[in-house]
């Protein structure tokens, strides 16, 4: 199965028809991020068969030009948002070297088998969580469950309560789950700094004889 097959299967379900209708309407009548062609970018950059790691975000950044369809990531010409700054600092502290993604564009991670998935895939300009409860959560919950059921030894990095609440969808006997507070300035000092998820992920991959991530 490819992501295309998996997504098309979801698109046949009744909830998705309602979701698509609502999202199409909002793209028509207001400013919505990311650009429509980037909604499923996380799926196009990380092939299902190459999947090693899932990093769950919440909804896309809601500032102009920030969202690009990958959780936490921004285009390289955009100033790094605070959460991204904190992620880069933790990588530096954890690994003793700078990230390959200092510019905030996490595309190199996605190409190494890291799925950067938001649980809500669209948002209106300036309005965080404005597309909450339209149906995206059903879609992404089903994607997480599909990964859990059909893959083995995927490492899930769950940062913050909303992401950690998805633990129930993941088979802990087949997969690895690392949790920490969210990297936002509000919670970064509650345990995101010092979580060492980047070195821990590579330790797990090494034990599995898989190629480590160049963070």
Curated annotation (Swiss-Prot):
The answer to keyword Transmembrane helix applying to this record is: no
Extract the CDD domains matched here. Answer: UDG-F1-like (cd10027)
Q: Name one GO cellular component term.
A: cytoplasm
Q: Which GO terms describe its biological process?
A: base-excision repair, AP site formation via deaminated base removal
Q: Which PROSITE patterns match?
A: U_DNA_GLYCOSYLASE
Q: Which reaction does it catalyse?
A: Hydrolyzes single-stranded DNA or mismatched double-stranded DNA and polynucleotides, releasing free uracil
Top-rank taxon of the source lineage equals Bacteria
Record EC number: 3.2.2.27
Gene Ontology MF: a single term: uracil DNA N-glycosylase activity
Q: Does the keyword DNA repair apply?
A: yes
Compartments reported by the entry? Cytoplasm
- Entry-linked InterPro entries: UDG_fam1, Ura-DNA_Glyclase_AS, Uracil-DNA_glycosylase-like, Uracil-DNA_glycosylase-like_sf
Active site per UniProt: 59 (proton acceptor)
**SMART domains recorded for this chain?**
UDG, UreE_C
Keyword list, A-Z: Cytoplasm, DNA damage, DNA repair, Hydrolase
Its principal location?
Answer: cytoplasm
**Which PANTHER family does the entry mention?**
URACIL-DNA GLYCOSYLASE
**Which NCBIfam families does the record associate with it?**
PRK05254.1-1, PRK05254.1-2, PRK05254.1-4, PRK05254.1-5, ung
Similarity field: Belongs to the uracil-DNA glycosylase (UDG) superfamily. UNG family.
Function of this protein?
Excises uracil residues from the DNA which can arise as a result of misincorporation of dUMP residues by DNA polymerase or due to deamination of cytosine.
Q: Return the protein name.
A: Uracil-DNA glycosylase
């Amino acid at each position: 199965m490819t992501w295309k097959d998996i997504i098309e299967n979801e698109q046949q379900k009744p909830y998705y028809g309602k979701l698509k209708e609502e999202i199409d309407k909002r793209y028509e009548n207001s400013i919505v991020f990311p650009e429509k062609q980037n909604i499923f970018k996380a799926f196009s950059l990380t092939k299902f068969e190459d999947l090693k790691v899932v990093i769950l975000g919440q909804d896309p950044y809601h500032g102009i030009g920030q969202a690009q369809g990958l959780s936490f990531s921004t285009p390289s010409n955009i100033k790094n948002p605070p959460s991204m700054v904190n992620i880069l600092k933790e990588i530096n502290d954890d690994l003793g070297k700078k990230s390959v993604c200092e510019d905030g564009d996490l595309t190199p991670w996605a190409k190494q088998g890291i799925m950067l998935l938001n649980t809500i895939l669209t948002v209106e300009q300036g309005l965080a969580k404005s597309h909450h409860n339209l149906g995206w959560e059903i879609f992404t919950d089903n994607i997480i469950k599909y990964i859990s059921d059909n893959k083995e030894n995927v490492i899930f990095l769950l940062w913050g309560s909303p992401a950690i609440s998805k633990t129930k969808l993941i088979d802990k006997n087949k997969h690895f789950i690392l949790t920490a507070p969210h990297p936002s300035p509000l919670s970064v000092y509650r345990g995101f700094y010092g979580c060492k998820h980047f070195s821990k992920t590579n330790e797990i991959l090494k034990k599995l004889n898989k190629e480590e991530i160049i963070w």
